[in-house]
Amino acid sequence: MSANDKQYISYNNVHQLCQVSAERIKNFKPDLIIAIGGGGFIPARILRTFLKEPGVPTIRIFAIILSLYEDLNSVGSEVEEVGVKVSRTQWIDYEQCKLDLVGKNVLIVDEVDDTRTTLHYALSELEKDAAEQAKAKGIDTEKSPEMKTNFGIFVLHDKQKPKKADLPAEMLNDKNRYFAAKTVPDKWYAYPWESTDIVFHTRMAIEQGNDIFIPEQEHKQ
């Protein structure tokens, strides 16, 4: 993928992608959010604002960090390529966080569904963690389906390309479990939190049509 395919995404664009996705995600009724770092952190925080309901406790956000992308050249290079192996850099300490996944609706957030490798790994490992917690409590989720942990996924962009890993078909086919704010061509999407020159980045996003797309008069204060 060449630098000519690079699409700049502004903070405004990210904010509004979360805004337009929130109503659908409310149908999932997430009890907690798990953000995949670093791309999922800011979308998760913005999304939580739009999911907030009066009189209801704020949804907790937890962070995991996985390594998949590796820079193939020197610092400052414009070339980035997908790695082939996922490794944990940071995971949830369930005991310290007093976090119980059993019976919860858990929303996993990342910025992009690219090769799907990272999302597959995160979902698989979190499902294992939930199963272990249920087993430790003596809960059989087959006999008590209300205690099953339900996972959903939200991404800003789903790239239309062959994926290197799978997600469960029942998730992908359920509009209330898999949420992509926008389906996009297979290009290089540069997000604002990766930028070292946000003024240039924002100008490019505006020129490419990747900035504000909801008219101001539709905003709710």
Swiss-Prot record:
Binding positions for GMP per the UniProt entry: 85, 110-118, 159, 188-194
Modified positions (N-acetylserine) in chain numbering: 2
Subcellular localization, as worded in the UniProt entry: Cytoplasm; Nucleus
GO biological process, one term: GMP salvage
UniProt keyword annotation of Nucleus present: yes
Keyword RNA-binding carried by entry: no
GO cellular component terms attached to this protein's record: cytoplasm; nucleus
EC numbers, comma separated: 2.4.2.8
pH-activity relationship: Optimum pH is 8.5.
UniProt pathway: Purine metabolism; IMP biosynthesis via salvage pathway; IMP from hypoxanthine: step 1/1
Active site: 114 (proton acceptor)
Role according to the record: Converts guanine to guanosine monophosphate, and hypoxanthine to inosine monophosphate. Transfers the 5-phosphoribosyl group from 5-phosphoribosylpyrophosphate onto the purine. Plays a central role in the generation of purine nucleotides through the purine salvage pathway.
Subunit field text: Dimer.
The protein's name: Hypoxanthine-guanine phosphoribosyltransferase
Organism: Saccharomyces cerevisiae (strain ATCC 204508 / S288c) (Baker's yeast)
Gene: HPT1
